[in-house]
Swiss-Prot record:
Protein name as annotated: 3-isopropylmalate dehydratase large subunit
Pfam families for this protein: Aconitase
UniProt family annotation: Belongs to the aconitase/IPM isomerase family. LeuC type 1 subfamily.
Cited InterPro entries: 3-IsopropMal_deHydase_lsu, Acnase/IPM_dHydase_lsu_aba_1/3, Acoase/IPM_deHydtase_lsu_aba, Aconitase_4Fe-4S_BS, Aconitase_4Fe-4S_dom, IPM_dehydratase_rel_enz, IPMI_cat
Superkingdom of this protein's organism: Bacteria
Record's cofactor remark: Binds 1 [4Fe-4S] cluster per subunit.
Reactions mediated catalytically: (2R,3S)-3-isopropylmalate = (2S)-2-isopropylmalate
Matches recorded under NCBIfam families: leuC, PRK05478.1, PRK12466.1
Binding site for [4Fe-4S] cluster: C336, C396, C399
Annotated pathway: Amino-acid biosynthesis; L-leucine biosynthesis; L-leucine from 3-methyl-2-oxobutanoate: step 2/4
C-alpha cells in the first residue's frame, strides 16, 4: 500500500514506538522565541542539563518586540522576556536573530527566509502557527513550554500519529481572490474543528500554482481549522525558494531526496475534501472565531445559538448586515499569515496614488527585517507612507494584544492576521480577518469594498 507525504516524513523520524501509540520522533529543527522559552531554559538549569543540539536550535525575537522604537522597550515584562532570551542564547550556545539584526522577524518567516525550513524536516516551535513550515513538505507543529524543554534536553518528542485528510483544491483563482480567501472559506465551510486529529495535505492544481508565500498562508491557518499539521508536496517552486539561502548549503545533495516527498498514487487518506475555487469570493469574518465568516456579497447569518448571539453582541453587529456596513477604524497589514513581500506588493498596487481614509488608522508591519529591506528597495515604504500608512519595524505587532500595538476598545479592525477571538488585538477590539488586498482597499475607502472591482 502506498504512503501519504505525511506518512513518509513521519516514518523516517520515528525512533521508538508502535503505530497507534505515542511514538518518539526525532526533531530536526527547533525554533524558539521570547515568550514560550524562558521556563524551558530554567528547567534545564534546575536539572543541570545542557542543550542536546544547540546547532539545531534557533531563536528570534518577535512577540513582544516594539515596532516603532525597537530599542526602547517600555513594558517591564516584555523587556524581561527579551533580555532573558538574549542571555539564554548566550548561555546555551543558541544562534539568535537578535533585535536589529538583518534576519530578525516573526519566527515563522525567519525559518523559511534563512533556509532553515526545508522539505522532509520535523520542525517544532512553542507557537501554534508552526504548521506554516509545512508548506515546504515538512512536518511542523506547535508545542507547549514543557515540550520545548523536552526537545531542549533530548531533541525528541513523544507524539501520536494523526489521521490523513486530503484537501484537493482546483480551479483558477478569480482576480481579487487569494490564498487567504481559500483557507478562510474552508474554515467557514467546515468549521474550526474539521481538522482535529488530522494532518491536512493540501493538493491540486490551485496549490501547485501558488507561490511559496501563498502556500505558507494556507498552512499557517491549518490550526484555525483544528489541525495541528498542514503540509504541501515540495516541488520546483519550493526548491527554487530554498536554493541559495544562508542555511541551505546542503541544497545540491538534498534536492533529489526532496523530490521523493509526495503522496503515492495508491496512498489512502482517511478523509478527502474537494474545493473548486473558480467562483470563490473575497472572504470577511464577522464574528469571534475564523468560522464566523461570509462571502463579501453575502449578509451576515441569522443567529443559530448562544455563541452567535455572543459574537454579535461583542462585535456590535446584527444579522442581515453586510461587510460594507462595518464602521472600520483600523487596518493592520502584518502577521505570520500575511506580512510577506508578495502580500505587501499586492496591497501596494491598491494603495498607490491614493490616500488613507480620514477615519482609518492604517499600519503596515513587515514580518521580518528581510521583507522590510526588500520592500524598501522596491519603494513600497514610500507608497504606503505617502498614502498615510504607518511603516513599522518587523514583529508580531497587532496580531495579538501582547505588545504596544493594540486596537482600541470597541473599534473594528480589518486585519490580515489569523485570529479574531475576543480581545485578540486588545481589550474589546473587534477583528475582521481578510486578505492583504481587502485590507488595503478598506484603508483607502474607509470601509470594506469588493476588492475585485478595485484591484489593478
Amino acid at each position: 500500500m502506498g504512503q501519504t507525504l505525511f506518512d513518509k516524513v513521519w516514518n523516517r523520524h520515528v525512533l521508538y514506538g508502535k503505530l497507534g501509540e505515542p511514538q518518539l520522533l526525532y526533531i530536526d529543527l527547533h525554533l524558539i522565541h521570547e515568550v514560550t522559552s524562558p521556563q524551558a531554559f530554567e528547567g534545564l538549569r534546575l536539572q543541570n542539563r545542557k542543550l542536546r543540539r544547540p546547532d539545531l536550535t534557533f531563536a528570534t525575537l518577535d512577540h513582544n518586540v516594539p515596532t516603532i522604537d525597537i530599542f526602547n522597550i517600555k513594558d517591564e515584562i516584555a523587556n524581561k522576556q527579551i533580555t532573558t532570551l538574549q542571555k539564554n542564547a548566550i548561555d546555551f550556545g543558541v544562534h539568535i536573530f537578535d533585535m536589529g539584526s538583518d534576519e530578525q522577524g516573526i519566527v515563522h518567516m525567519v525559518g523559511p527566509e534563512t533556509g532553515l525550513t526545508q522539505p522532509g524536516k520535523t520542525i517544532v516551535c512553542g507557537d501554534s502557527h508552526t504548521a506554516t513550515h509545512g508548506a515546504f513538505g515538512a512536518i511542523a507543529f506547535g508545542i507547549g513550554t514543557s515540550e520545548v524543554e523536552h526537545v531542549f534536553a533530548t531533541q525528541t518528542l513523544w507524539q501520536t500519529k494523526p489521521k490523513n485528510l486530503k484537501i484537493d483544491i482546483n480551479g483558477t483563482l478569480p482576480t481579487g481572490v487569494y490564498a487567504k480567501d481559500i483557507i478562510l472559506h474552508l474554515i467557514k465551510t467546515y468549521g474550526v474543528d474539521f481538522g482535529t486529529g488530522y494532518a491536512l495535505e493540501f493538493t491540486g492544481e490551485t496549490i501547485k500554482n501558488l507561490s511559496m508565500d501563498g502556500r505558507m498562508t494556507i498552512c499557517n491557518m491549518a490550526i484555525e481549522g483544528g489541525a495541528k499539521y498542514g503540509i504541501i508536496q515540495p516541488d520546483d517552486i519550493t526548491f527554487e525558494y530554498v536554493k541559495g539561502r544562508p542555511f541551505a548549503d546542503n541544497f545540491a545533495k538534498s534536492v533529489d531526496k526532496w523530490r521523493e516527498l509526495y503522496s503515492d498514487d495508491d496512498a489512502i487518506f482517511d478523509r478527502v475534501i474537494e474545493l473548486d475555487v473558480s467562483t470563490l469570493e473575497p472572504q470577511v469574518t464577522w464574528g469571534t472565531n475564523p468560522e464566523m465568516g461570509v462571502n463579501f456579497s453575502e449578509p451576515f447569518p441569522e443567529i443559530n445559538d448562544i455563541n452567535d448571539q455572543r459574537a454579535y453582541d461583542y462585535m456590535g453587529l446584527e444579522p442581515g448586515q453586510k461587510a460594507e456596513d462595518i464602521d472600520l477604524g483600523y487596518v493592520f497589514l502584518g502577521s505570520c499569515t500575511n506580512a510577506r513581500l508578495s502580500d505587501l506588493i499586492e496591497a501596494s498596487h491598491i494603495v498607490k496614488g491614493n490616500k488613507v481614509h480620514p477615519n482609518i488608522t492604517a499600519i503596515v508591519v513587515p514580518g521580518s527585517r528581510t521583507v522590510k529591506k526588500e520592500a524598501e528597495k522596491l519603494g513600497l515604504d514610500t507608497i504606503f507612507k505617502n498614502a498615510g500608512f504607518e511603516w513599522r519595524e518587523p514583529g508580531c505587532s497587532m496580531c495579538l494584544g501582547m505588545n504596544p500595538d493594540q486596537v482600541p476598545e470597541g473599534v473594528h479592525c480589518a486585519s490580515t492576521s489569523n485570529r479574531n477571538f475576543e480581545g485578540r488585538q486588545g481589550k474589546g477590539a473587534r477583528t475582521h480577518l481578510v486578505s492583504p488586498a481587502m485590507a488595503a482597499a478598506a484603508a483607502i475607502h474607509g470601509k470594506f469594498v469588493d476588492v475585485r472591482k478595485v484591484v489593478v
